[in-house]
Amino acid sequence: MAQVLHVPAPFPGTPGPASPPAFPAKDPDPPYSVETPYGYRLDLDFLKYVDDIEKGHTLRRVAVQRRPRLSSLPRGPGSWWTSTESLCSNASGDSRHSAYSYCGRGFYPQYGALETRGGFNPRVERTLLDARRRLEDQAATPTGLGSLTPSAAGSTASLVGVGLPPPTPRSSGLSTPVPPSAGHLAHVREQMAGALRKLRQLEEQVKLIPVLQVKLSVLQEEKRQLTVQLKSQKFLGHPTAGRGRSELCLDLPDPPEDPVALETRSVGTWVRERDLGMPDGEAALAAKVAVLETQLKKALQELQAAQARQADPQPQAWPPPDSPVRVDTVRVVEGPREVEVVASTAAGAPAQRAQSLEPYGTGLRALAMPGRPESPPVFRSQEVVETMCPVPAAATSNVHMVKKISITERSCDGAAGLPEVPAESSSSPPGSEVASLTQPEKSTGRVPTQEPTHREPTRQAASQESEEAGGTGGPPAGVRSIMKRKEEVADPTAHRRSLQFVGVNGGYESSSEDSSTAENISDNDSTENEAPEPRERVPSVAEAPQLRPAGTAAAKTSRQECQLSRESQHIPTAEGASGSNTEEEIRMELSPDLISACLALEKYLDNPNALTERELKVAYTTVLQEWLRLACRSDAHPELVRRHLVTFRAMSARLLDYVVNIADSNGNTALHYSVSHANFPVVQQLLDSGVCKVDKQNRAGYSPIMLTALATLKTQDDIETVLQLFRLGNINAKASQAGQTALMLAVSHGRVDVVKALLACEADVNVQDDDGSTALMCACEHGHKEIAGLLLAVPSCDISLTDRDGSTALMVALDAGQSEIASMLYSRMNIKCSFAPMSDDESPTSSSAEE
């Protein structure tokens, strides 16, 4: 912006211009400017320009040249300076220049305006042009120029002294005005912006002064309180601190002076290592105490058993009984090159268990009384026999009763039943039937045959048997072991059986094999009536403990194996040479682990807080494994399942409901497994319990009713069981995966018998799955003509239903190339059209007339 050069008034005695007559004291102010009370003259255009800037109107205005108003403004030396005076107040953006911009009434210069470089501004340019024009007008009157030159030079020197640029020479400045530089204006703006920022910072700091004063007072108060507290602590705790420091100083020289201290530290380290080995927590101590108590009980039981064996009780004669005596005898008789085992105890004598005479078991030694005569030929059967027979009074002391010796037999070819072989034994007690404790796999049938009398004992077991048959004295004893049949590849021409004796150490010591001819196999084929599928591999007796929590001793494992084999044995009736009638009985005994687990679950069902999480988990796992092992195998025996159900019901009805519907990790219950194995006798027992949930779906989304579509119905009893299952459940329920019903699954797998049973139970044939398919569409797609006929025979069958693709059953049959089924559907459609009611316009007479 342009800066105005202020020329001071001439001092007294110096030549100066005369007072211009153009400024009378009482003349009116020119209308283009206004005079302030302090003697300033402000241009009205400038005031309007400032007002526009404040209002935001910064549009460039067109410069209009005004002609000088000669009538209102007097022509004089100072008349041209009027417009230039307006720049005095706002001529510079720098506050330092305002101190030298004095525009007094009597200090107006007549000429020589000082111009400085600044930014381009139309208002300033117009003012400068006006001033130059006025100077040109007065250039013709050279009055007073000589007197003004020194003063002008002095003013210029003064401006240079204060830092202002020198004035433009008269010869060139007015003719060619120089606009202000942009750099100077930018510098001024930066200074103003910096000053404003600093001012704002100072204002903010001033506002923070009261807050800082409050904080300072708070800190001073806290400092005072902490000082008082520190003084009190020093006063109270100084003696203790002094003693602590003195004790520390006394302890430092002890280790190097006394070597005994090092030994003391080593002893302390040994104690800490011992402590680290101890269990932490009351739970660990309780568990250890429980283990020790269990071991103590086992040791006491073994001690009592040893004392009982050492005792030599004398046989006593008992008075003759009033009624017939019931005699149970167990005997295992194998074919050629097999071992004959007889185990019994005298009536009234303490129970005698077969004990190990050697470090490793080599067989079962016969427990027989001395002086026994040879028994007549007997028959071998897969059953435990309980026979009612009279016993003479003289032979009362020789009556024997069976004790718990379990032997498990597994067939290598999965046949329904093994041939029954009669045999003669020199060590069999008189008046008793001999049977073998074996475990059949498929059938309850039996075929008694004559067993050859030739025997070839094996290893030490044969010699021990011969010694017992000879009537050696002393308390009888034998090897506690489990007879296990090892699976072998089935031979199409011969049936081989392999027996292995498993000692308490779990090792196999001796084995025996026998072979039977092809005729025996043909006999077995006649007894196969319940095995719908190939036999699955079932864990043997020796492998059974792997499904249960492992024991702490090998003896416990052996006892558990014996109990498991007793629970699962399935034995048909035996026939003696005398032809006496016998009654069938299946021995069932719950293991102690299963009993304790059932009792624990019963407590939990009555009170959910009665058991801890660990106890509940152990009980649940035990019951689940035992129940699934018992009822979920393909060869599960229905009578054994029924007796377990009776036992569970006797304990608690809620326990029965819980056990029957217990599911494994895949959501399958015993009913799921029994139906999938087509073991419908077990299914019948489960349904008779009254608590079986027949609509329970597994994780795959299938219920037992749906799984019936995969089973094969062989007998009429199976069909009756399936019908009972269908009546108890919802036969129209959909699977969670594809929305298929039991009828759709049976149709897809081509189970005609199951389809008939479902239709007999009024299954809905028009139910659609997630894809919109019906059972009739499934039959058309898979080409089951017979099933399609059964479905079309249902009056409610709708053949006009469409799936998601808009296809009907007829279209599906045509796409699948099933022309016969398509013709059946077409005939059904024509029959429906012929029986449909016709109007008068569609009568046969009218149609024939049209033709």
Curated annotation (Swiss-Prot):
Processing and modification events after translation: Phosphorylated by casein kinase II upon estrogen stimulation. Phosphorylation induces the release by KANK2 of NCOA1 and its translocation to the nucleus where NCOA1 can activate gene transcription.
Biological process annotations from GO: apoptotic process; kidney epithelium development; negative regulation of actin filament polymerization; negative regulation of cell population proliferation; negative regulation of G1/S transition of mitotic cell cycle; negative regulation of intracellular estrogen receptor signaling pathway; negative regulation of programmed cell death; negative regulation of transcription by RNA polymerase II
Presence of keyword Disulfide bond: no
Spans of repeat ANK: 614-651, 666-696, 700-733, 738-767, 771-801, 805-835
Region span, Interaction with AIFM1: 1-72
Outcome (variant: Y702A): 4-fold decrease in binding to KIF21A
Region (Interaction with NCOA1): 669-835
Tissue: Strongly expressed in cervix, colon, heart, kidney and lung. Expressed in kidney glomerular podocytes and mesangial cells (at protein level).
Ranges of compositional bias, category Low complexity: 304-315, 419-436
Disulfide pattern: none
UniProt-listed Gene3D superfamilies: Ankyrin repeat-containing domain
Known partners and oligomeric status: Interacts (non-phosphorylated form) with NCOA1; NCOA2 AND NCOA3. Interacts with AIFM1. Interacts with ARHGDIA; the interaction is direct and may regulate the interaction of ARHGDIA with RHOA, RAC1 and CDC42. Interacts (via ANK repeats 1-5) with KIF21A (via residues 1146-1167).
Function, as annotated: Involved in transcription regulation by sequestering in the cytoplasm nuclear receptor coactivators such as NCOA1, NCOA2 and NCOA3. Involved in regulation of caspase-independent apoptosis by sequestering the proapoptotic factor AIFM1 in mitochondria. Pro-apoptotic stimuli can induce its proteasomal degradation allowing the translocation of AIFM1 to the nucleus to induce apoptosis. Involved in the negative control of vitamin D receptor signaling pathway. Involved in actin stress fibers formation through its interaction with ARHGDIA and the regulation of the Rho signaling pathway.
Name of the protein described by the UniProt record: KN motif and ankyrin repeat domain-containing protein 2
Lineage per the UniProt record: Eukaryota, Metazoa, Chordata, Craniata, Vertebrata
